[in-house]
Amino acid sequence: MSQANLEFPESVAAAPRGPYRGRFAPSPTGPLHIGSLVTALASWLDARVHGGTWLVRIEDIDFQRNVPGADRDILASLETLGLVPDEAPQWQSAHLPRFEAALAQLQAIDRLYPCGCTRREIADSITTVDAQGRLRHQTLIYPGTCRNGLMGRPPRAWRVRLPDADAATVCFDDRWQGTQCQNLAEAVGDFVLKRADGMWAYQIAVVVDDAAQGITDVVRGADLLDSTPRQIYLQRLLGLPAVRYLHVPVVVNAAGEKLSKQTGARAINRSQPLAALTEAARHLGLEIRAADMEGFYRAAVPAWAHRLAQLTPAA
């Protein structure tokens, strides 16, 4: 079956590409902090500059990491900050049938296979210094052990089958970071779409949900830049619309680590929303001086447009 003949069931049908639709997609692993606010603000401003729609999607399918009540706390913080989505928020955990349907489509075109390897076995199979050094976000480069069969092992996970050599190279133009290229076979190998614990991998879930919601533009942190080629590859396999990407610099702590709950990020102070917004804008290269939130947003939208113009004429 050719890629052009792929048809999704209605549950995973992609909305047609049209006017700008962006989104902020936090995971409910803790309260909103300055690092995630930077991404939320950038995505909101980008939607406003382009006269588009801004959505919020709670990416809560990694149930082991979810913090009870964090989703509602994040939404409450966004509302206090004036970042209110144009449509009702969605929860990724409500979309599991979409992901199953996408997996079935990939299996139908022989781009999916079961894997019985453990992480320890994969690590032990990587013996050269060069291979050990080629890790992306602590993702082991899969050597393809189960490509031709499980060899008596029980299936643990499901992996996408990549093409060989240069056919596995994906390039895209990031609106902030510039042209990016990655050879998926060399950088990550056949990557997991459904994990051994039954959880869905981020790569397949975000691709399917973005398409279903008609997302045209993704604005997010540069820590996810490395994931983008995998997502573009899946979009192409599934015949989904292309998405434009903009990856903003991540906020780091004094040790140079990405600011997160694990590295001591503090929750946004909802009693001082203007101060939080001003700090987030500064991380984006925007110096906004305003007496109130209305004045902040009135100044921030044209400031973001000017910031984009400094990056690239096509932004």
Curated annotation (Swiss-Prot):
Classification via SUPFAM superfamilies: Nucleotidylyl transferase
InterPro entries: Glu-Q_tRNA(Asp)_Synthase (IPR022380), Glu/Gln-tRNA-synth (IPR000924), Glu/Gln-tRNA-synth_Ib_cat-dom (IPR020058), GluQ/Sye (IPR049940), Rossmann-like_a/b/a_fold (IPR014729)
Binding of ATP, residues: 261
GO process terms (BP): glutamyl-tRNA aminoacylation; tRNA modification
Cofactor note: Binds 1 zinc ion per subunit.
Top-rank taxon, per record: Bacteria
Binding site for Zn(2+): 115, 117, 142, 146
Keywords carried by this UniProt record: Aminoacyl-tRNA synthetase, ATP-binding, Ligase, Metal-binding, Nucleotide-binding, Zinc
Enzymatic class: ligase
Cofactor names: Zn(2+)
Enzyme Commission numbers on file: 6.1.1.-
Sequence motif 'HIGH' region, location on chain: 26-36
Residues binding L-glutamate, per UniProt: 23-27, 59, 202, 220
Cleavable signal peptide: none
One of the record's GO molecular function terms: ATP binding
UniProt cross-references to PANTHER family, sorted A to Z: GLUTAMATE--TRNA LIGASE, GLUTAMYL-Q TRNA(ASP) SYNTHETASE
Name of the protein described by the UniProt record: Glutamyl-Q tRNA(Asp) synthetase
